[in-house]
Amino acid sequence: MSSFPNTVAEGRRSGKAPEKSTFSQTCSLLSQFLKEKRASADSTLGIGGKMEPKANTKALLGSLQNSDGALKLSASAMEFLPQLVENPCIKKSRSPGPESPQLTIFYAGKMLVFDAFPPEKATEVMEMATKLASNNSGTEESPPSLPVTTEKLAVSKMPQTNTSSETPKPGNQGVGSDMRYPRRASLLKFLEKRKERVNARGPYQMNNLKPEGSSSGGEPEDQCSKQFDLNF
């Protein structure tokens, strides 16, 4: 800042005409001002904080070598990429295989679901189920003699049930016998009276009746008289 006013004052004192144009002078003064500003800024940075050390030539050469190696590695990788893309074995190994489906089994009124069940195991399970079903059907069909034995047992048991059902109780038998005798006696009386009426109305009377004491042929005569009276 001190140089700029000094030059202006010296020019005025000398009274000489400026050799350079005002534009060039202002540009030079501006460049000097900027240089002084930069110098002051560098000095303040050096006081406030440490300056970074300048890179050595060895470090620069090492970084260049490392960059060359990285470029070589990248070039070799780019050359190897088409081989990876074209190789089908690598594709198969890296490509994820298809997920195995689920297996659902209905057994004893329940639904069982197995995740990621391979198809080979499913075929084995089906074969085992068919074998067990065939064995069970064979064991059920093998003994045909069982129904015959059951029928025989049923036939042998039938008379026992019939006898037990036919045998009346003593109380019921007495009541039935008491009811049958008066009915029979009243029926006989009715038939005798009817027979007498028929004989009285007929053209001739039947005198071939046997005495009441004959017990051997009493029942067939009563039956014949019943049939005769009913026919009339």
Curated annotation (Swiss-Prot):
Localization per record: Nucleus; Cell membrane
May I have one GO cellular component term? plasma membrane
Composition bias, Polar residues: 133-142, 158-167
* Chain intervals with Basic and acidic residues compositional bias: 10-19, 190-199
Query: Mind telling me how this protein is modified after translation?
Result: Ubiquitinated. Targeted for degradation by the SCF(COI1) E3 ubiquitin ligase-proteasome pathway during jasmonate signaling. (Microbial infection) Acetylated by Pseudomonas syringae HopZ1a.
Coiled-coil residues: none
Subunit info here reads: (Microbial infection) Interacts with the pathogenic Pseudomonas syringae HopZ1a protein; this interaction leads to its degradation.
**Record-given protein name:** Jasmonate ZIM domain-containing protein 1
